[in-house]
Structures are given as structure tokens and as C-alpha cells.
């Protein structure tokens, strides 16, 4: 499956820890990330990640384009709800596309862990049928 990993600045450490904890599962899938998030995960875990631009420079929109083309299966986006983001419209557009195209989306560690366990059990294999 194709999985996108995104994290706002104040959540990047959480994302790196999360990726490290679930590395054995992530290694079985194709990973994509916004620029800095992807770099930090790669440096900490050695995971292979296709990196796009940083979120404020269009990375969220690049991942959104993958969703619109049915070329992404899951999004894990650790958002910082307490800090205003200069690219908030891009973030909202990405979340909207996940809803429009029924892409599993986690926006915090608790929901991300649920998605990872579902992925490990094969509960998300229906995505393969939609291709």
C-alpha cells in the first residue's frame, strides 16, 4: 500500500518516534512524505521514502494530487491544532480530499496506531480492489 506521512513542525518528533515504532510494518509498504518530515524519518529509521516539497511550499498539494488520482491508500498527518499554519487552506484541502476519495486518515497518534494495526491485520486490503 502507498502511505503518506505528514507532520506539522511541533509534531515532527512524534512522527519520527511513531515511524521508528512501526518500522517493521512501514518497511512492507511504499512511503511518501512532505520534505522535512520525510528527511527526519529517513535519517532516524533508514526507511525509504519518496519526499515531496515541504508542506508550506506545496507538499500537501502534491500528496493531495496523489489522492485525486487514486494513487495513495492511507494518510497519517500529525497536525498541531494549537498553532496557526500559514498553509491552512492546503491542509484543509488535503483533509477534504481524503473524505471525498475515502482515504483512511489519522490526524493524531491514537488514530494512527489504530490504522497501523488495521493495516497489519489486512483490514485495509479493500483499497487494493479500488485500483
Curated annotation (Swiss-Prot):
Substrate binds at residues 8, 12, 34-37, 54-55, 87. It is an enzyme of class 4 (lyase). CDD domains: MGS. Keywords: Lyase. Residues 1-131 form the MGS-like domain. The keyword Transferase does not apply. Its EC number is 4.2.3.3. It catalyses: dihydroxyacetone phosphate = methylglyoxal + phosphate. SMART domains: MGS. It comes from the Bacteria. SUPFAM superfamilies: Methylglyoxal synthase-like. The active site is at residue 60. Disulfide bonds: none annotated. One of its GO terms (molecular function) is methylglyoxal synthase activity. GO terms for biological process: methylglyoxal biosynthetic process. The keyword Magnesium does not apply. GO terms for cellular component: cytosol. Belongs to the methylglyoxal synthase family. Catalyzes the formation of methylglyoxal from dihydroxyacetone phosphate. This is Methylglyoxal synthase. It comes from Bacillus cereus (strain ATCC 14579 / DSM 31 / CCUG 7414 / JCM 2152 / NBRC 15305 / NCIMB 9373 / NCTC 2599 / NRRL B-3711). The gene is mgsA.
